[in-house]
Amino acid sequence: MQFTLIFFYATLAAFGLAAPSEQVGRDVVQEGDELDKRINFKIPYTGADLVDGDDVQEGDKLDKRINFKIPYTGADMVDGDDVQEGDKLDKRIGFKLPYRGADMVDGDDVQEGDELAKRPNFKMPYKGADM
């Protein structure tokens, strides 16, 4: 028992003396020090070897993809007109979700296509703690 305590305290003393009391090293960062930005951080180009027929070498500066567009892959017919690749499509004006709720709103019969008023002052019930 005594040997265990002596060994324990000797180990603590040895590690305590071996550990440096100050941070050792070059350019130690302290709390509150302003850090430099990573200068000229660039993502390496890992794309194709040919751009517009020109051979691309490592380190070449590449142009941005001007007017990059996602190709249209939707239906072939829009409003009865044949849609060709490259045609500019209009936005869906007045797109509305169909009403699929109850048949009665405030005692009135609701028909398909009727415009429904927004629910004023709709509130979620409070389900939190009492205090």
Swiss-Prot record:
Q: Report the domain of life of the source organism.
A: Eukaryota
Task: Alphabetically list the UniProt keywords.
Answer: Repeat, Signal
Report the PTM annotation: GigA is processed by several endopeptidases including kexin proteases to produce 2 identical copies of the nonaxapeptide Ile-Asn-Phe-Lys-Ile-Pro-Tyr-Thr-Gly, one copy of the nonaketide Ile-Gly-Phe-Lys-Leu-Pro-Tyr-Arg-Gly and one copy of the nonaketide Pro-Asn-Phe-Lys-Met-Pro-Tyr-Arg-Gly, that are further modified into phomapsins B, C and A, respectively. After being excised from the precursor peptide, the core peptides are cyclized and modified post-translationally by enzymes encoded within the gene cluster.
Q: What does this protein do?
A: Ribosomally synthesized cyclic peptide phomopsin precursor; part of the gene cluster that mediates the biosynthesis of the epichloecyclins, a group of nonapeptides, with a likely cyclic structure and dimethylation of the conserved lysine. The gigA translated product contains 4 repeated peptide embedding the nonapeptide Ile-Asn-Phe-Lys-Ile-Pro-Tyr-Thr-Gly in repeats 1 and 2, Ile-Gly-Phe-Lys-Leu-Pro-Tyr-Arg-Gly in repeat 3, and Pro-Asn-Phe-Lys-Met-Pro-Tyr-Arg-Gly in repeat 4 that are converted into epichloecyclins B, C and A, respectively.
Organism annotation: Epichloe festucae (strain Fl1)
Q: In which pathway does it act?
A: Mycotoxin biosynthesis
Identify the propeptide residues.
19-38, 48-65, 75-92, 102-119, 129-131
Residues of the signal sequence?
1-18
- What name does this protein carry? Ribosomally synthesized cyclic peptide phomopsin precursor gigA
Q: Does the keyword Signal apply?
A: yes
Is Signal there in the keyword field? yes
